[in-house]
């Protein structure tokens, strides 16, 4: 209560922040007459003047008023669009590295030009991140006209470009691209075999469009570069025959082979099911008599069984995926769009392929991966913009250190958001929706009906056809018609059914899309024809406004309030009238899982008839609380994943830094010499423990190991027989001397220059191979670590401890393999070096995936394509290496061991 009174008296924190920025707007506006008076050349010359001032030490904050005034004037001259005062506030929020929440139709794309122009003056590059390639190309071409007018260069990165094209795009002052492409380019750069193969510059400043989609919804889905792993697809087909014979357990402790946890999107085998499955597997010849499913040798069976069980019980055709051209195409849960080329990981995609009877593509082994959370936290300054961020403000702050500021609208919003109507059954709900649509169509009101799945959109379309109501359907199956359907969605009486595809980034103009109509006329259209089209559009526009504007109908509440708000946001843009209402039933997923009992009891107490609905703010609150529960659960999952991924990320930073140093070094012989010395020393210590007596020595074992692992045939026993004075220290020195002599002989034969090249090539190849194997081992560790909880151990602490031990082991193994290879191999000429390089360059076999990640707690982090959040969060700033910075030898090692870098991962170099 006191908080509410204080807000009324003093205003909210958001209001106070906006007021402070409004003072800066006055300074920008005061410069407008002076800037308007400049010629085009004088305006363009300001860019170079600003750059010189930055080089002389002026900060971007100092330049902001004048730079914003210049960008606004350039936009007015080039595009005929002048930034409103509220858009200037949005630009300042982006410059400060915050998230600007701006409502639909408020011109987010134009707002970004202000901060982009200002930061491009630093010459360090600006990345503008969009959700798809179409928007990246469109915005680069559209807004690029402003930047090019002001003398700045613009690039765009999209899949399929050559290395030279990508490099040129990243060298530009401003680079547009998708989150996927920026992330994949980072991974590819860290797999490059030559310094000139890398394309990205430092990660200085980025503006993320639709920031909630990228940093929240997609945070559970890592980017993965993978290569094929040899594994038979037959096991998936055998499991897909077994799973339909299993029975679901409907109630706790009831009969059944498995039960579903729909909240966590996981399937679990019961005790009874365990026995039944073993019998079925034995009948299929997959399990020996007397063997247990959970024997160590049968881990692969458990993996395939779990994947098949999830595929059959939790993933539905036309909801979670489509079958197109004999392939499984994932449907994004949050956008409703098909995502060809994206695959679920951990065998789930293959299990769905087996279920649908389409060709099973081979599983892949991870070569490199990163989450969006850890990729975007590498930028020195990160900003974002979206129409719906306020509900996730805590997560943005907690994970990324990003503050959310709501920007006021240019015109007041007058949309009427009506309370939800809740029915007992889905049939009653759809009857009411059809009635509402009929009324709107008769009164010239356009209607947008939002559904949560392709299946629901087709079901509603069937009902509308039966009622003889003309309509358009927009879902992942007919996405190629999207532009035409959206252009006509604002016509008087138009009815459009759409999945979440229409919820984000689509602009429905009342009366239809005038620009699209004018574009259809062609360049040779007469002035009279153009004026006629404009008059017709104005008449339609006025009719729709008089009828009440666009009416948005939601057929089901989404797990996230943001997605619902995005759907509502299609109506009431730029001060237009409009309305929205959600129709729900107790059979809807959200209510069934989270709020069904309470709502059902309420309906029974009210003695409701068939077809009656509850309409009450209290009901809306119950539903909102259910959504809050899901959002809190999803946040916990994302936070949990991040805690685990941060361990892998620390290791990734160490490996990638070492790799960069290797790549940039012309001569790695000092590193190789140190490694050889360390490895030979540790091998000797294995067989001749320091400080031990002669009887404890295993000289024969040492001889054998030196020959088999390093190609060194040393007669150690003969030396000892011939020289009684040889003790541990002198024997050690003699072995080292022989090893060095052997290696120098190799150098004389091959030539120093050839051997230096070969050393570098071998080190890179072994580093990549051991890192790949380490990633696979880390994946296996993650999958089973939650079981430590049953032993009263903290899975996170156990994971950190074991992951660190595995990392240390990997580094030791890497050194031993490099030294062994270099000692054994015969380098004949430069062709050998080229052969190693060619083998390493096999980029063609790689796949680039934005793959489903599972929760590391053993609870399912995800069903479909993504859910998420990205973060600049609780990691201490000292541990966050700026891109490419070298760790000091005496600094704490970033892998988290607590040791100094030189005594830990720095040993590698």
Curated annotation (Swiss-Prot):
Give me the segments passing through the membrane.
Answer: none
Q: Which InterPro entries match?
A: Helicase_ATP-bd (IPR014001), Helicase_C-like (IPR001650), P-loop_NTPase (IPR027417), SEC_C_motif (IPR004027), SecA (IPR000185), SecA_CS (IPR020937), SecA_DEAD (IPR011115), SecA_motor_DEAD (IPR014018)
Q: Which positions bind ATP?
A: 87, 105-109, 507
Outline what the protein does: Part of the Sec protein translocase complex. Interacts with the SecYEG preprotein conducting channel. Has a central role in coupling the hydrolysis of ATP to the transfer of proteins into and across the cell membrane, serving both as a receptor for the preprotein-SecB complex and as an ATP-driven molecular motor driving the stepwise translocation of polypeptide chains across the membrane.
Can you state the subunit structure given in the record? Monomer and homodimer. Part of the essential Sec protein translocation apparatus which comprises SecA, SecYEG and auxiliary proteins SecDF-YajC and YidC.
A GO molecular function annotation here is: protein-exporting ATPase activity
Chief location of this protein within or outside the cell: membrane
Protein's membrane topology: Peripheral membrane protein
Cofactor(s) it depends on: Zn(2+)
Classification via Pfam families: P-loop_SecA, SEC-C, SecA_DEAD, SecA_PP_bind, SecA_SW
- Identify the SMART domains for this entry: SecA_DEAD, SecA_PP_bind
Query: Can the keyword Signal be found in this entry's annotation?
Result: no
What family is reported? Belongs to the SecA family.
| Catalyzed chemical reaction(s) | ATP + H2O + cellular proteinSide 1 = ADP + phosphate + cellular proteinSide 2
Q: What EC class is this?
A: translocase
* SUPFAM superfamilies according to UniProt: Helical scaffold and wing domains of SecA, P-loop containing nucleoside triphosphate hydrolases, Pre-protein crosslinking domain of SecA
Q: Where is the composition biased (Basic and acidic residues)?
A: 837-848
Q: Where does Zn(2+) bind?
A: 893, 895, 904-905
Record EC number: 7.4.2.8
Q: Which CDD domains match?
A: DEXDc_SecA, SF2_C_secA
Organism field: Alkalilimnicola ehrlichii (strain ATCC BAA-1101 / DSM 17681 / MLHE-1)
**Chain intervals with Gly residues compositional bias:** 859-871
Task: Output this protein's name.
Answer: Protein translocase subunit SecA
The record's free-text note on cofactor binding: May bind 1 zinc ion per subunit.
Identify the GO cellular component terms for this protein. Answer: cell envelope Sec protein transport complex; cytosol; plasma membrane
Name its cellular compartments: Cell inner membrane; Cytoplasm
Map out region (Disordered) in residue numbers: 834-909
């Amino acid at each position: 209560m006191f908080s509410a009174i204080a807000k009324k008296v003093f205003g909210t924190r958001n209001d106070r922040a906006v007021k402070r920025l409004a003072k800066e707007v006055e300074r920008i506006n005061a410069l407008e007459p002076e800037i308007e008076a400049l010629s085009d050349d004088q305006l363009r010359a300001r860019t170079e003047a600003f750059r010189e001032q930055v080089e002389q030490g002026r900060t971007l904050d100092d330049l902001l008023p004048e730079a914003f005034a210049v960008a606004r004037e350039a936009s007015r001259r080039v595009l005929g669009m002048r930034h409103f005062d509220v858009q200037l506030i949005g630009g300042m929020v982006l410059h400060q590295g915050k998230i600007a929440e701006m409502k639909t139709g408020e011109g987010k794309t134009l707002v970004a030009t202000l901060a982009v122009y200002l930061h491009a003056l630093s010459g360090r590059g600006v990345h503008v991140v969009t959700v798809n390639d179409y928007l990246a190309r469109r915005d680069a071409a559209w807004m690029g006209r402003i930047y090019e007018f002001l003398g700045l260069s613009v690039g765009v990165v999209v899949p399929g470009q050559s290395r030279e094209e990508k490099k040129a795009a990243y060298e530009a002052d401003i680079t547009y691209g998708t989150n996927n492409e920026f992330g994949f380019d980072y991974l590819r750069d860290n797999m490059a075999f030559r310094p000139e193969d890398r394309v990205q510059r430092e990660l200085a400043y980025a503006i993320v469009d639709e920031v909630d989609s990228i940093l929240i919804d997609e945070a559970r889905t890592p980017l993965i570069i993978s290569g094929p792993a040899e594994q038979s697809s037959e096991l998936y087909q055998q499991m897909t025959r077994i799973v339909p014979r299993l029975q679901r357990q409907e109630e706790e402790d009831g009969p059944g082979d498995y039960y579903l946890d729909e909240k966590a999107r996981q399937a679990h085998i019961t005790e009874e099911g365990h026995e039944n499955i073993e019998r079925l597997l034995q009948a299929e010849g997959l399990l020996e008599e007397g063997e247990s499913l959970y024997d160590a040798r049968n881990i692969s069976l458990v993996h395939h069984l779990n994947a098949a069980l999830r595929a059959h019980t939790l993933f539905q055709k036309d909801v979670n995926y489509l079958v197109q051209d004999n392939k499984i195409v994932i449907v994004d849960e949050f956008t409703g769009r098909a995502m060809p080329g994206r695959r679920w990981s951990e065998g789930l995609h293959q299990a769905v392929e087996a279920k649908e009877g389409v060709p099973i593509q081979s599983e892949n082994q991870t070569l490199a991966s990163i989450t969006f959370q850890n990729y975007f936290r590498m930028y020195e300054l990160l900003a974002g913009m979206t129409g719906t961020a306020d509900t996730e403000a805590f997560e943005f702050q907690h994970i990324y250190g990003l503050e959310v500021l709501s920007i006021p609208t240019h015109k007041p919003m007058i949309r009427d958001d009506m309370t939800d109507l809740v029915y007992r059954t889905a049939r009653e709900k759809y009857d009411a929706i059809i009635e509402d649509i009929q009324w709107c169509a008769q009164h010239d009101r356009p209607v947008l009906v939002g559904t949560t799945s392709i299946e629901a959109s087709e079901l509603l379309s069937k009902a509308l056809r039966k009622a003889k109501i003309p309509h358009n359907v927009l879902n992942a199956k007919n996405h190629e018609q999207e532009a035409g359907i959206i252009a006509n969605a604002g016509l008087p009486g138009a009815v459009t059914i759409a999945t979440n595809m229409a919820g984000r980034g689509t602009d429905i103009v009342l009366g239809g899309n005038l620009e699209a109509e004018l574009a259809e006329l062609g360049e040779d259209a007469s002035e009279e024809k153009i004026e006629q089209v404009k008059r017709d559009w104005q008449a339609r526009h006025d009719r729709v406004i008089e009828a009440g504007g666009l009416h948005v109908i939601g057929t089901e509440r989404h797990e996230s309030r943001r997605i619902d708000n995005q759907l509502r946001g299609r109506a009431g843009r730029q001060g237009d009238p409009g309305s929205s209402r959600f129709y729900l039933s107790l059979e809807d997923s959200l209510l069934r899982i989270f709020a069904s009992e309470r709502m059902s009891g309420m309906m029974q107490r009210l003695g409701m008839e068939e077809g009656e609905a509850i309409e009450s703010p209290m009901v809306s609150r119950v539903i909102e609380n259910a959504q809050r529960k899901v959002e809190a659960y999803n946040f916990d999952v994302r936070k949990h994943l991040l805690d685990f991924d941060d361990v892998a990320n620390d290791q990734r930073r160490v490996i990638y830094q070492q790799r960069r140093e290797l790549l940039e070094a012309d001569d790695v012989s000092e590193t190789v010499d140190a490694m050889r010395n360390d490895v030979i020393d540790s091998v000797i210590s294995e067989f001749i423990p320091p400080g031990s007596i002669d009887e404890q020595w295993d000289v024969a074992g040492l001889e054998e190991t030196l020959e088999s692992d390093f190609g060194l045939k040393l007669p150690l026993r003969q030396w000892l027989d011939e020289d009684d004075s040889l003790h541990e220290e002198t024997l050690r020195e003699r072995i080292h001397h022989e090893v060095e002599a052997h290696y120098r002989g190799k150098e004389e034969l091959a030539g120093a220059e050839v051997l230096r090249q070969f050393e570098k090539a071998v080190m890179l190849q072994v580093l990549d191979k051991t890192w790949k194997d380490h990633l696979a081992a880390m994946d296996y560790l993650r999958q089973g670590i939650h079981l430590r909880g049953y032993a009263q151990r903290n899975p996170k602490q156990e994971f950190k401890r074991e992951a660190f031990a595995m990392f240390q082991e990997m580094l030791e193994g890497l050194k031993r393999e490099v030294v062994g290879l270099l000692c054994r191999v015969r380098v004949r000429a430069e062709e050998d070096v080229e052969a190693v390089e060619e083998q390493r360059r096999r980029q063609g076999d790689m796949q680039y995936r934005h793959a489903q990640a599972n929760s590391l707690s053993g609870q399912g982090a995800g069903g479909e394509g993504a859910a998420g959040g990205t973060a600049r969060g609780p990691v201490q700033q000292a541990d966050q290496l700026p891109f490419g910075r070298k760790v000091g030898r005496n600094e704490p090692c970033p892998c988290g061991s607590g040791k100094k870098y030189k005594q830990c991962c720095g040993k590698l170099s």
